[in-house]
């Protein structure tokens, strides 16, 4: 028809979205969930996985975290071979554990060991939210308790980086008792004059936030980290009030006295170094008395 002659034709051919995706290999680019900026993954990794545009702190795995804070080549891992069983015979639990082991190349949701920060020996534990959302089961609690006891034996500070959804439901009461076990180990370490630094990263919730994560001599957190016990919706339904938009963020907790500092990832190693340096003389005096 004549009117078809006057229809404005597209100047460019439409390229199917699938074809566009195929042009960029997986893993080359990363999209920031906060500002939506797309950047080279290599650039993000170089910046300690902090968005170069908005400063959003992307999750780090355990090994990336250890590399960012410890002296190169100084880390020695503890209890690497410990693995979770299925004591309550929870359906499908063993398959999920095996799937996470293959996906993360970890045996559990926490890596523990010793290393140095500016040549100062520390015992460190780093939780990895890729493994069962960093949930705390029997092995996670046992590894953390053993790490604290090792710090006690070596008379050195203990540092933990938390990232967890809370207690592991598939292990029931056995997971909940880890809250008490880890807290008792930390109390023994504290009574002997040992330093404990807790660094809460996104997210730190449930039984982890209600136990060892909040017991530090210094409680630090990364910017924007979600930290809390119960979920926002549960709390609002309980108190029947609308909560502030920034409720349960690291900044909110700092303003209300639950944290000592919110530390940017770029500054974390130096902040830890300064704390360790300040306590070096005093702590050794306590141990030796």
Curated annotation (Swiss-Prot):
**Compartment(s):** Cytoplasm
Q: In which pathway does it act?
A: Lipid metabolism; malonyl-CoA biosynthesis; malonyl-CoA from acetyl-CoA: step 1/1
Required cofactors, per record?
A: Zn(2+)
Q: How is the cofactor bound?
A: Binds 1 zinc ion per subunit.
In terms of Pfam families, this protein maps to:
Carboxyl_trans, Zn_ribbon_ACC
**Catalysis: reaction(s):** N(6)-carboxybiotinyl-L-lysyl-[protein] + acetyl-CoA = N(6)-biotinyl-L-lysyl-[protein] + malonyl-CoA
User: Which InterPro entries does UniProt cross-reference here?
Assistant: AcCoA_carboxyl_beta, Acetyl_CoA_COase_Trfase_b_su, ClpP/crotonase-like_dom_sf, COA_CT_N, Znf-ACC
* A GO cellular component annotation in the UniProt record: acetyl-CoA carboxylase complex
Q: Which domain of life is it from?
A: Bacteria
What are the entry keywords? ATP-binding, Cytoplasm, Fatty acid biosynthesis, Fatty acid metabolism, Lipid biosynthesis, Lipid metabolism, Metal-binding, Nucleotide-binding, Transferase, Zinc, Zinc-finger
Residues in C4-type zinc fingers run 32-54
**GO terms for biological process, alphabetical:** malonyl-CoA biosynthetic process; mycolic acid biosynthetic process
Occurrences of domain CoA carboxyltransferase N-terminal (ranges): 28-289
A GO MF term: zinc ion binding
Q: Which residues are recorded as binding Zn(2+)?
A: 32, 35, 51, 54
Q: What is its EC number?
A: 2.1.3.15
Function, please? Component of the acetyl coenzyme A carboxylase (ACC) complex. Biotin carboxylase (BC) catalyzes the carboxylation of biotin on its carrier protein (BCCP) and then the CO(2) group is transferred by the transcarboxylase to acetyl-CoA to form malonyl-CoA.
Family the entry assigns? Belongs to the AccD/PCCB family.
Record's subunit section: Acetyl-CoA carboxylase is a heterohexamer composed of biotin carboxyl carrier protein (AccB), biotin carboxylase (AccC) and two subunits each of ACCase subunit alpha (AccA) and ACCase subunit beta (AccD).
Can you say what this protein is called? Answer: Acetyl-coenzyme A carboxylase carboxyl transferase subunit beta
Source species of the chain: Bacillus cereus (strain ATCC 14579 / DSM 31 / CCUG 7414 / JCM 2152 / NBRC 15305 / NCIMB 9373 / NCTC 2599 / NRRL B-3711)
Name the gene behind this protein.
accD
């Amino acid at each position: 028809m004549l009117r078809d002659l006057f229809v404005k034709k597209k100047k460019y051919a439409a390229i199917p979205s699938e074809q566009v995706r195929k042009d960029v290999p997986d893993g080359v680019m990363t999209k920031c969930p906060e500002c939506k900026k797309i950047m080279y993954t290599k650039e993000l990794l170089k910046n300690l996985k902090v968005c170069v545009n908005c400063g959003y702190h992307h999750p780090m795995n355990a090994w990336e975290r250890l590399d960012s804070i410890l002296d190169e080549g100084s880390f020695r891992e503890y209890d690497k071979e410990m693995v979770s069983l299925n004591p309550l015979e929870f359906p499908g639990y063993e398959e999920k554990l095996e799937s996470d082991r293959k996906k993360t190349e970890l045996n559990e949701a926490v890596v523990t060991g010793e290393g140095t920060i500016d040549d100062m020996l520390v015992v460190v534990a780093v939780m990895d939210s890729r493994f069962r959302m960093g949930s705390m089961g029997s092995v996670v609690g046992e590894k953390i308790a053993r790490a604290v006891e090792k710090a006690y034996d070596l008379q050195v500070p203990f540092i933990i980086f938390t990232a967890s959804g809370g207690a592991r439901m598939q292990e029931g009461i056995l997971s909940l008792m880890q809250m008490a076990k880890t807290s008792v180990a930390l109390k023994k370490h504290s009574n002997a004059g040992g330093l404990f630094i807790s660094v809460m990263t996104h997210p730190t919730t449930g039984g982890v936030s209600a136990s060892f994560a909040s017991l530090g001599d210094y409680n630090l957190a990364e910017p924007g980290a979600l930290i809390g016990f119960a979920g926002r919706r549960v709390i609002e339904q309980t108190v029947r009030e609308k909560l502030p938009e920034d409720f349960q963020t690291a900044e909110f907790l700092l303003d209300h006295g639950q944290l000592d500092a919110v530390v940017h990832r770029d500054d974390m190693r130096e902040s830890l170094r300064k704390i360790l340096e300040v306590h070096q003389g005093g702590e050794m005096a306590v141990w030796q008395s």
